[in-house]
Amino acid sequence: MGQIRSILRGIAYDRTESPARVLRRVDQVLAGLQIGSMATALIARIEQTPEQARRGLRTLRWSSAGHLPPVLLRPDAGVQVLETAPERLLGVNATETRSDHSAELRPGDTVVFYTDGLVEHGRTGIDEGVERLTRTLGELQGLPLEELCDQVLGRIVVGRTDDDIAVLAVRCHPQNAG
């Protein structure tokens, strides 16, 4: 996993390519270097056109290699799992293309990314775990980000340490005029 992480960071560092293209390049490097590892990954970036800037909007663009979907929290519309068709893990096939996905972001929106260790444990399947996460996020969505993440971990993890667990939350703030 460490090799894959380093390759991904190196390729993504100064690229303007789409997230799907970055993941495809990682697949190609893994095949070319004959690294026999596989991993899930999700790469995302927040973009903004001049027109979106005038309107205070942004676009979340992401591509997933077998990773769980991000969750979008909207102050005025609740919680939405950004489900997409599943795609293969990194390191499985270097020749197939990957897909980009996008969602419009408004001021106040929060996007939450997480590892499977947060939602999958014991007899709880991934679907149940994601459902629990979305319910929890709905209850906590007005909190400052650090507190939101701490509360999510405190309510869902409950002493488990059998898998890696990570939560990352990004909130869109209103832009300054000028």
Where are these regions (language model features)?
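Conserved subregion of the PPM/PP2C metallophosphatase catalytic domain
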Residues: 5-178
